[in-house]
Amino acid sequence: ETKWDNKSKMIPDTDINKNPNVGIGKDSDESYVFIYVKNAIVKDGEDALAKTPYFTLNANWSPVVDDAVGAKTNGNNNQYVSGLFMYTAGVPGVSAVLAPADDKAAYTGELFSTVHIPAVMNNTDVVDNPAMTVSCYIFGADQKGGETGAAANALAQAKKWAEKQA
């Protein structure tokens, strides 16, 4: 995260720079990449989702659909608050392989570029130690396992991993 400042102030109706990006080294195997975002900023309660900071995905990423660990919105399209996301290289809904080329590392591009602090959030809504934790899961692209293909296996394994992050 090249723009993240851990001392950023959460001011209602503003954006905070936060730009998670995943890379693999030039000698790495081709891989599927997943990111889980855990948003532990706002207390549970009435209208908690409307008060929860959210982000909008960039083009190389898609939400994972899953009742337990899937991407969650605040009720508005493309305003994500948490969950599992997959690298798609710009093809919505289709897992893509991240592969180093020309003896150089490869990067996914930012999952999102900013986090928006809703205008309705105030200091009484925030937990004592607010945090938005972004974790990455990288899975070798040649591992089919018991699934129909490597992409399906990567997704199944990422969902199991995400359960431990939630």
Q: Can you say where each PLM-predicted feature lies in the sequence?
A:
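Short acidic, flexible loop segments centered on an aromatic residue
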Residues: 30-44
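Cationic, hydrophobic amphipathic alpha-helical membrane-interacting segments
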Residues: 9, 26, 33, 70-71
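C-terminal, structured domain-capping segment
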Residues: 14-33, 90-166
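Beta-sheet-dominated interaction scaffolds and their linkers
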Residues: 1-17
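A surface/secretory-pathway sequence property marking extracellular, secreted
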Residues: 41-88
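Short glycine-rich beta-strand segments
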Residues: 25, 38-42, 60, 137-139
